[in-house]
Amino acid sequence: MKVCVIYDTKKGSTEMIANWMRESIERKAEVRMMHVTKVDSLKDCDLVVIGSPIYYERPLKSVLKFLEQRQNELKGKKVAVFVVCMAGIFGHAGKTYAEKRYVGALIKRVPGKIIGTAIIRGWIRKPDFSQKVVVQKWIKELLKNLEVKS
């Protein structure tokens, strides 16, 4: 199984989170981690994990553009999406808002089968290493679901 983790970042937190994902995946499967502007092909990816930080109430344009331009390659693929934002600090209401507004903006551009979504709490200055456990748990669940559904 080959997993491709694709991301963009502004200040580095989404890249760090993508690296945590890569570390978790490489224990169980082959993994490639790529910046959204450096993706060559998705042909050999069994699972595509795509993530974006949230700025000014939306995912980065580069990630949205990637999803729109890669429609044909994503058709028939299993896809998981994640966003990195501060909505989680607002409890259930913040999470519900983020699912609809941020995750929804990504999902509606994915022609493949969505097998998972995540809202990961970002940070302003110092990395929040407690989120590494959240990431590891999500990846473990994704891979388990992928094995069951394959």
What are these regions (language model features)?
Residues 16, 23-32, 44-47, 52-150:
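FMN-binding flavodoxin-like domain, especially the glycine-rich phosphate-binding loop
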